[in-house]
Amino acid sequence: MAYVDYSSNYMSQIPFRTGFGYDVHRLSDGYDLWLGGVKIPYEQGLEGHSDADVLLHAVCDALLGAAALGDIGVHFPPSDMTYKGIDSKILLSRTCTLVREAGYEIGNIDATIAAEAPKINPHIPQMRRVMSEVMGIPEMDISLKATTTERLGFVGHREGMEAYATALIAVKGAF
């Protein structure tokens, strides 16, 4: 496996960049359900090394990917006990700092959560508020959607949840 040096000071000549993120976690008893930095009432939660906020993890990967800074596992590895049980809002905040330190501004986020239950839509306004505060961008620049998988696959069988996210960033001053 080739080693990729994400510490390069190289700045792309492309003023606008997009990134894509994906994350998945298993639903299990004994965990709280955190999505978009919001605790959602439900009988199960997502299992993971951190608080397993599948949405915020996908957003982190989208932002890091857009800036060519690797992925969430590179910066916050599950092998590091510092991140055991960590609030994913902290990871998102640190990710935004990394992106800004690399010379970029965050434009917008578009993300989708796939879950059979519970209903996610009632919680989206609060998720957008929380993410806006953590990321330092306007709520109107954060689009969140929820869908089911029509009872297909592990998500449809209520075994887990997944999230997809895209991010637009730009070289500072391009917006």
Region locations from a protein language model:
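RNase III-family endoribonuclease catalytic core
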Residues: 10-125, 135
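Short, low-complexity, polybasic intrinsically disordered segments
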Residues: 124-128, 158
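Pyridoxal 5′-phosphate
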Residues: 144-148
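Mobile acidic interaction elements
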Residues: 151-153
